[in-house]
């Protein structure tokens, strides 16, 4: 249970960014696989997995006592969020180990996820440094973004009191671009970079 809570708190910047996109652009936060992979008929009946955004695949255990779980991986490269395994899928089912203290979470190649060191609560988490998980494609490319405000005030986006950062990585270089109202952005400290691929 402790590891699940740590995972939840570490994913808050990514989830917060997804909710911002839902607010401003109508995107879905949690989505079925067929929404992201509509031409893959194998995804049409998958009802035991979900994506957060287009880049984070969650394969939970839904029955008590199970130590393994079967998950479908659409075509592409998928990295475990822990960085300890890689799945090069041609569109296939994979049997994953699922010990009690583990939630199977995989990052889709081509995505950059902002994370943060977990703490006792969300307010304390916000005081911790950010980390980036960079999941490179076989060609060496990834992109992601972060929307960050003070986490408490209303209408920070409308007032321009936020920081928005676009992260890009390629086999040649890495870079960021940011925006917010002049002099009002919320500071973001990057403390760690995890490169997958």
Q: Which residues make up each language-model segment?
A:
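Catalytic core of carbohydrate-active enzymes
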Residues: 1-196
């Amino acid at each position: 249970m402790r590891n699940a809570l740590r995972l939840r708190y570490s994913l808050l910047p990514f989830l917060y960014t997804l909710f911002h996109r839902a607010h401003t652009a109508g995107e879905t936060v949690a989505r079925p696989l067929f929404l992201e992979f509509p031409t893959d008929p194998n995804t049409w009946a998958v009802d035991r997995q979900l994506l957060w955004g287009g880049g984070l695949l969650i394969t939970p255990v839904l029955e008590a006592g199970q130590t393994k779980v079967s998950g479908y991986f659409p075509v592409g490269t998928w990295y475990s969020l822990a960085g300890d395994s890689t799945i090069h899928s041609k569109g296939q089912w994979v049997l994953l180990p699922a010990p009690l203290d583990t939630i199977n979470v995989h990052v889709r190649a081509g995505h950059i996820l902002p994370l943060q060191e977990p703490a006792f609560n969300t307010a304390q988490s916000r005081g911790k440094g950010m980390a980036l998980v960079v999941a490179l494609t076989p060609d060496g490319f990834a992109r992601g973004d972060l929307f960050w405000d003070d986490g408490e005030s209303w209408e920070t986006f409308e007032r321009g009191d936020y920081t928005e950062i676009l992260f890009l990585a390629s086999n040649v270089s890495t870079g960021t671009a940011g925006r917010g109202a002049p002099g009002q952005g919320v500071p973001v400290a990057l403390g760690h970079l995890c490169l997958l691929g």
